[in-house]
Amino acid sequence: MDRPKPQTVRELADTLCIPLVDILLPCRFCNRFLAYIELVAFDLKGLQLIWTEEDFVFACCSSCAYATAQYEFSKFYEQSVSGRELEEIEHKPIGEIPIRCKFCLKKLDLLEKLDTCYRHQQFHKVRRNWKGLCRHCGSIG
């Protein structure tokens, strides 16, 4: 029986029994190898590795994540709502709703979601998924 394929960079490093710093992962979009800081950021963002049928594995570099997020927002934007409206639409509390950063694609934690509500900022539906603003992108934007 086949073992499940690793979904994170850390799982891949553990499966291969090599240090994370020695992992060489190409970006699926630009084919550049991710730098160590990008490997760590990939896992912190809650992204998953991309596996091909031939068992090649890819990730997404920070530059391509930003470009993808921008492209999707410009082409697949659906609507913007407040936090309370989002809870009404999804019939769930904000903490249970998956929301990614509209710039870097990081999965927002509860504090980032609540901060968006506190600041009366909007959440955006893009390609059937919710987007907000993470603390890092919010601090530089």
Swiss-Prot record:
<keyword id="KW-1035">Host cytoplasm</keyword>
<dbReference type="GO" id="GO:0052150">
    <property type="term" value="P:symbiont-mediated perturbation of host apoptosis"/>
</dbReference>
<comment type="function">
    <text>Plays a major role in the induction and maintenance of cellular transformation. E6 associates with host UBE3A/E6-AP ubiquitin-protein ligase and modulates its activity. Protects host keratinocytes from apoptosis by mediating the degradation of host BAK1. May also inhibit host immune response.</text>
</comment>
<dbReference type="GO" id="GO:0042025">
    <property type="term" value="C:host cell nucleus"/>
</dbReference>
<dbReference type="GO" id="GO:0003677">
    <property type="term" value="F:DNA binding"/>
</dbReference>
<dbReference type="GO" id="GO:0006355">
    <property type="term" value="P:regulation of DNA-templated transcription"/>
</dbReference>
<keyword id="KW-0862">Zinc</keyword>
<keyword id="KW-0899">Viral immunoevasion</keyword>
<keyword id="KW-0479">Metal-binding</keyword>
<dbReference type="GO" id="GO:0008270">
    <property type="term" value="F:zinc ion binding"/>
</dbReference>
<dbReference type="GO" id="GO:0030430">
    <property type="term" value="C:host cell cytoplasm"/>
</dbReference>
<protein>
    <recommendedName>
        <fullName>Protein E6</fullName>
    </recommendedName>
</protein>
<keyword id="KW-1048">Host nucleus</keyword>
<dbReference type="GO" id="GO:0006351">
    <property type="term" value="P:DNA-templated transcription"/>
</dbReference>
<keyword id="KW-1090">Inhibition of host innate immune response by virus</keyword>
<keyword id="KW-1119">Modulation of host cell apoptosis by virus</keyword>
<dbReference type="InterPro" id="IPR001334">
    <property type="entry name" value="E6"/>
</dbReference>
<dbReference type="GO" id="GO:0052170">
    <property type="term" value="P:symbiont-mediated suppression of host innate immune response"/>
</dbReference>
<keyword id="KW-0010">Activator</keyword>
<keyword id="KW-0804">Transcription</keyword>
<keyword id="KW-0945">Host-virus interaction</keyword>
<dbReference type="GO" id="GO:0039648">
    <property type="term" value="P:symbiont-mediated perturbation of host ubiquitin-like protein modification"/>
</dbReference>
<keyword id="KW-0244">Early protein</keyword>
<dbReference type="Pfam" id="PF00518">
    <property type="entry name" value="E6"/>
</dbReference>
<keyword id="KW-0805">Transcription regulation</keyword>
<feature type="zinc finger region">
    <location>
        <begin position="101"/>
        <end position="137"/>
    </location>
</feature>
<feature type="zinc finger region">
    <location>
        <begin position="27"/>
        <end position="64"/>
    </location>
</feature>
<keyword id="KW-0863">Zinc-finger</keyword>
<dbReference type="GO" id="GO:0039502">
    <property type="term" value="P:symbiont-mediated suppression of host type I interferon-mediated signaling pathway"/>
</dbReference>
<keyword id="KW-0238">DNA-binding</keyword>
<dbReference type="InterPro" id="IPR038575">
    <property type="entry name" value="E6_sf"/>
</dbReference>
<comment type="subunit">
    <text>Forms homodimers. Interacts with ubiquitin-protein ligase UBE3A/E6-AP; this interaction stimulates UBE3A ubiquitin activity. Interacts with host BAK1.</text>
</comment>
<comment type="similarity">
    <text>Belongs to the papillomaviridae E6 protein family.</text>
</comment>
